């Protein structure tokens, strides 16, 4: 039987429609799953640290923080106000909403610790009273262990006992609109903390574990292994990064831990990459090197304990006077444009474009 063109068109359309519907349904389902996963990664923690104006503005500057709201927490009543918190025993508290894929609770707490006096009782900066006490209030029971470990590590840095209150969240009330985004509305308003400390990166050693020796031998080139593990030195002026001045970061070739920034790189004329300082002071350590009948200060990476190079006191005087002379074979350059994809998005704000 011969079929008409009209019949064939209608048949094709009918056959195609269910397939299209299935594709749309599948696409919609996938988008919903992604949205659900993204929502599941959004967490909340409540932080008290003196006047909430500064703490709110500080938290909002941190990579991975999605929102910060000023409020009152862990008082004795379900209602309060700015005028009443002295009577209801609420603490000025910032509700911090963050993406756990971008910043962990442990790292977020390290930022928090940078701007409080953890040994002070009912006092932060010039602010005094129970409403200005320090506190970490949680809703997820799993957060309690993370908070406990962070506080134990913090205590090792102080002789006095840490006085930060840790409790499940209760009686949280959002503060009056006047207090929300206060420092955005009043740029010269009162702030007891240096909010620019949020721009100083927190680099967690635990994120960059050291591979085994066998893994290093498989991963590194012979030159990279020789330099990082046996403290050898590559040739000057014929290495990869001595004349590279693109914006980005330099990471330990053995672990991936960030060690230097393009912000601090300069032309020293020595033929090796030269920096005025590490990206933060904690990512390197030093040993005395008496080899070749010289007394030098060796620079090693924190997580990988890899030999990076040496530091000398003939650097730019206006930038501290130091010159970190580093082997290209010990580091890997991550361009600014690739930092987010490579997992270093949290450092982008600290790199000058």
From Swiss-Prot:
Has an important function as a repair enzyme for proteins that have been inactivated by oxidation. Catalyzes the reversible oxidation-reduction of methionine sulfoxide in proteins to methionine. It is an enzyme of class 1 (oxidoreductase). In the N-terminal section; belongs to the MsrA Met sulfoxide reductase family. This is Peptide methionine sulfoxide reductase MsrA/MsrB. The lineage of its organism: Bacteria, Pseudomonadati, Pseudomonadota, Gammaproteobacteria, Pasteurellales. It comes from Haemophilus influenzae (strain ATCC 51907 / DSM 11121 / KW20 / Rd). The active site is at 51, 325 (nucleophile). It catalyses: L-methionyl-[protein] + [thioredoxin]-disulfide + H2O = L-methionyl-(S)-S-oxide-[protein] + [thioredoxin]-dithiol; [thioredoxin]-disulfide + L-methionine + H2O = L-methionine (S)-S-oxide + [thioredoxin]-dithiol; L-methionyl-[protein] + [thioredoxin]-disulfide + H2O = L-methionyl-(R)-S-oxide-[protein] + [thioredoxin]-dithiol. InterPro entries: Met_Sox_Rdtase_MsrA_dom (IPR002569), Met_Sox_Rdtase_MsrA_sf (IPR036509), Met_Sox_Rdtase_MsrB (IPR028427), Met_Sox_Rdtase_MsrB_dom (IPR002579), Mss4-like_sf (IPR011057).
């Amino acid at each position: 039987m011969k079929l008409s063109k009209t019949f064939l068109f209608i048949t094709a359309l009918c056959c195609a429609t269910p397939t299209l519907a299935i594709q749309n349904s599948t696409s919609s389902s996938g988008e919903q799953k992604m949205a659900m996963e993204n929502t599941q990664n959004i967490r909340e923690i409540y932080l008290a640290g003196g006047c909430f104006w500064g703490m709110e503005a500080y938290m909002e500057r941190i990579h991975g923080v999605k929102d910060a709201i000023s409020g009152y927490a862990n008082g004795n009543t379900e209602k309060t106000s700015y005028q009443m918190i002295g009577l209801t025993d609420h603490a000025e508290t910032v509700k911090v909403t963050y993406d756990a894929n971008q910043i962990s609770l442990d790292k977020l707490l390290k930022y928090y610790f940078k701007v409080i006096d953890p040994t002070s009782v009912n006092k932060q900066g010039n602010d005094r009273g129970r409403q200005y006490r320090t506190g970490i209030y949680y809703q997820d029971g799993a957060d309690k262990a993370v908070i406990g470990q962070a506080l134990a590590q913090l205590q090792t840095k102080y002789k006095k006992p840490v006085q930060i209150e840790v409790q499940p969240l209760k009686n949280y009330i959002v503060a009056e609109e006047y207090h929300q985004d206060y420092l955005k509305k009043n740029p010269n308003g009162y702030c007891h903390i240096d909010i620019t400390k949020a721009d100083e990166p927190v680099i967690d050693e635990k994120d960059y574990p050291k591979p085994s020796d066998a893994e290093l031998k498989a991963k590194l080139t012979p030159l990279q292994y020789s330099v990082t593990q046996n403290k050898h030195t590559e040739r000057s002026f014929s290495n990869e990064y001595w004349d590279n001045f693109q914006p980005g970061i330099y990471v330990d070739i053995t672990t991936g831990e960030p060690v230097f920034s393009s912000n601090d790189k300069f032309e020293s004329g020595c033929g090796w990459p030269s920096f005025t300082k590490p990206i933060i002071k904690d990512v390197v350590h030093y040993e005395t090197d008496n080899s070749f009948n010289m007394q030098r200060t060796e620079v090693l990476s924190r997580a990988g304990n890899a030999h990076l190079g040496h530091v000398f006191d003939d650097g730019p005087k206006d930038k501290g006077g130091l010159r970190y002379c580093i082997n290209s074979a010990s580091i890997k350059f991550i361009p600014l444009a690739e930092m987010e994809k490579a997992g270093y998005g949290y450092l982008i704000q600290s790199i000058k474009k």
